[in-house]
Amino acid sequence: MQKGYKMQEIIKTIEKIAVKISEELKYADLGYTDHANSTGDTQLKLDVKSDNIITQEFIGVSSVRSLVSEEKEDALDIHKDGEFIIAYDPLDGSSLVDVNFAVGSIFGVYKNELKPSNLVAAIYCIYGPRLEMVVCEDTPKLYRLDRDGSFKFIKDLSLKEKGKLNATGGTQKGWSGAHRDFIKTLFDEGYRLRYSGAMVSDLHQILLKGGGLFSYPATTDAPNGKLRVTFEVLPFAFIYERAGGATTNGENKSLFEINLEKIHQTTPCFFGSKYEINRLLEFYND
């Protein structure tokens, strides 16, 4: 089985997953379970259902060695001779489903070992008025589900040198002085606030609108950030950097310089056009 075929099989599997999760979102129970995930968040029934859909679909893909889910404490080994590890957030923004906001699924495809340098592809699906998917091996590519049930290529995606949108997470009272000053500067420059609380939706908007900044900084109540490196942060860092943008944790030059020590590790994170990231680092390093 050739390398290209293996990756195509993974992508096609994610297409099937996206359609199934999209259908579940229309009709499924929005209630909570009696369980918490690895980071202590109470699991929605939709989180568990989405996780189960992903697991069942990937069990049939022999090139996948193991699955690493935000909803599971440990990796699930499925094919001992597989070469890829799929790390994923089955339903990012699931707490917003009850208000009918767009939510999504995030996938990072790692080769042989779960470390930043081994990430070879990133894919996310966004469940909104339309079902869309962004696939990135080299250049991010946008696909949309068509009437005939297939995903049609729409366009390559790229970021401008400077954007206009600002999506900033975290409770403001917990921000550092440097972050507060930086965000004020962006608004003084005319940036528009665009923040829904779903990472996929906010980063998708910035990517499709050509640029801006998404940030989830360290706060007093979450000094190591809240977003998870393997499932959320690195896949989007992979996409943004290949779209011509930049990423940082506020210290390193790139989010790919993070020392990954555990599956559910979190980090402060910033994604955007090069202008915004460079300006942020000026404030953070002052």
From Swiss-Prot:
Signal peptide: none annotated. Its cofactor is Mg(2+). The keyword tRNA processing does not apply. Its EC number is 3.1.3.11. InterPro entries: FBPase_C_dom, FBPase_class-1, FBPase_N, FBPtase, SBPase. HAMAP family: FBPase_class1. This is Fructose-1,6-bisphosphatase class 1.
